[in-house]
UniProtKB/Swiss-Prot annotation:
Gene: glyQS
Ligand binding (ATP): 200-202, 210-215, 287-288, 331-334
Binding site for substrate: R105, E168, F215, E216, Q217, M218, E219, E327, P328, A329, A330, G331
UniProt subcellular location: Cytoplasm
Entry protein name: Glycine--tRNA ligase
NCBIfam families: glyS_dimeric, PRK04173.1
Known partners and oligomeric status: Homodimer.
Reactions that this protein is recorded to catalyse: tRNA(Gly) + glycine + ATP = glycyl-tRNA(Gly) + AMP + diphosphate
Protein task: Catalyzes the attachment of glycine to tRNA(Gly).
Family as reported in the entry's similarity comment: Belongs to the class-II aminoacyl-tRNA synthetase family.
């Protein structure tokens, strides 16, 4: 008889504490009490973000001949959002608990119930307990709540100056489709990619940096001939899933979620989410990225509303068509969170007293690690320190390198392990004699003696693709 297994505990809270303690992520406005809906990225967090963006851009744009980049405005003409359907349909069902007077998305409550019990609630919201008190729920009737964040341009806050902060980067791509096709001399199949901030008036932000009102997206719109869309859709689902595993995510912690037909967005014929097993309370899986077949909806609606022809004329086949669009849309900070959670580990390391200590280590892929190497003089010494600083300065020409001379060497190793630094380089008293240093690898803790003039080449060999 198989023994029942206890579900592994979520590492999200542990990782969140580490992120705050080591300067990856800070609560926004912490000196004023902070807010659940926004976070600031510290010195290490911004490096990790940039590394993720760099790997995405390399994978999606610079390594391909059929994709180019774009950086469109955050505030687009209001007509864009009216044409796209966002003003009319970008709403969520909002309910309020009559017990705590807190507001929730009704669809999230229903989905959480179904995930926990394996079936939808027989009596709808009436069967759902209050998330905060656990009491049988008493809810208001659902009402629609706009996810668009409004702003006003010009001297007067009136209807004429009403604009929206973009809820997605995609529309900036669609309205530039013709510009890019013409100036970059592209023809379907080809893609336009961009990375940028988007804003959504989320009812219930939370789960650390997972759901926020201001967030960063990595999106690409791939324009294809109608009839070839299903084949390209599957290609991008497979390609995007492989990107996460190539950067170190355990395949066991990833899954594909097919949106039911009745829950598809108004523009989509098929959407598949790439989800990560975060093990949130009440929801085991969380979406990292959606890959949607948006059909010809976007170019068609913008063509109709703007009066601009957004079709493509295929000279080889003497036919004109409006391209279909395949959209891989990833959340940058959700990816960052998944990489951190998946990389977090605890193991044992020898200490100075001959025993072992529990060490925390982020086993991040070297391409993502915020700091690539740390230079550590064995002690603060008039001979060692200048040599170590010179080495760090030389290596900084190529990589993000830390210099740390504070505390016992074992403690300094631990500090680098828990931020994911792949290599620690120790300058010791033997260095003064043999002109060599000790390089320690993060995961195995194995050490090698390398000549000073070979250190740069050693790191270059082990940090390919960063």
């Amino acid at each position: 008889m198989e023994k029942s297994r206890v579900a592994p505990k979520s590492k999200v809270d542990t990782v969140a504490n580490l992120a705050k303690r080591r300067g990856l992520v800070y609560p926004c406005g912490e000196i004023y009490g902070g807010t659940k809906s926004a976070w600031d990225y510290g010195p290490l967090g911004v490096e990790l973000k940039e590394n993720i963006k760099r790997q995405w851009w390399r994978s999606m744009v610079t390594s391909r001949e059929d994709v180019v980049g774009l950086d469109s405005s955050v505030i687009l003409p209001r007509q864009v959002w009216e044409a796209s359907g966002h003003v009319a349909t970008f709403t969520d069902p909002l309910v309020e608990s009559l017990i705590t007077h807190k507001r929730y998305r009704a669809d999230h409550l229903l989905e959480a119930y179904e995930e926990k019990h394996g079936h939808p609630p027989a009596n709808g919201l009436a069967d759902i307990r209050d998330p905060e008190t656990g009491e049988p729920g008493r809810w208001t009737e659902p009402r629609n709540f706009s996810g668009l964040l409004k702003t006003f341009l010009g001297p007067v806050d009136d209807e004429e100056g009403l604009h929206y902060l973009r809820p997605e980067t995609a529309q900036g791509i669609f309205i530039n489709y013709k510009n890019v096709e013409t100036t970059a001399r592209k023809k379907p199949p080809f893609g336009i990619a961009q990375i940028g901030k988007s804003f959504r008036n989320e009812i219930t932000p939370g789960n650390f940096i997972f759901r926020t009102r201001e967030f960063e997206q990595m999106e690409m719109e791939f324009f294809v001939k109608p009839g070839e869309d299903e084949q390209w859709h599957q290609y991008w689902i497979d390609t995007r899933l492989a990107w996460y595993t190539d950067l170190g995510i355990d395949p066991e912690n990833l899954r594909l979620y097919e949106h039911p037909k009745e829950k598809l967005s108004h523009y989509s014929t098929r959407t598949v989410d790439i989800e990560y097993r975060f093990r949130f309370q009440g929801s085991e899986w969380g979406e990292l990225e959606g890959v949607a077949n948006r059909t010809d909806y976007d170019l068609k609606t913008h063509s109709e509303h703007s009066g601009t022809e957004l079709s493509y004329f295929d000279q080889a086949n003497n036919e004109r068509y409006i391209p279909y669009v395949i959209e891989p849309a990833a959340g940058l900070t959700r990816s960052l969170m998944a990489f951190l959670v998946d990389a977090y580990a605890e193991d044992e390391a020898p200490n100075a007293k001959g025993g072992v200590d529990v060490r925390t280590v982020l086993r991040l892929d070297r391409r993502l690690a915020p700091v690539k190497a740390a230079v550590l003089p064995l002690s603060r010494n008039a001979d060692l320190t200048p040599k170590a600083k010179d080495l760090a300065a030389q290596l900084r020409k190529h990589w993000n390198v830390e210099f740390d001379d504070a505390g016992a060497i074992g403690r300094r190793y631990r500090r680098q392990d828990e931020i994911g630094t792949p290599f620690c380089i120790t300058v010791d008293f033997d260095t003064l004699e043999d002109q060599a240093v000790t390089i320690r690898e993060r995961d195995s803790m194995a050490q090698e003696r390398i000549a000073l003039d070979k250190v740069e080449g050693y790191l270059a060999q082990h940090l390919i693709g960063v």
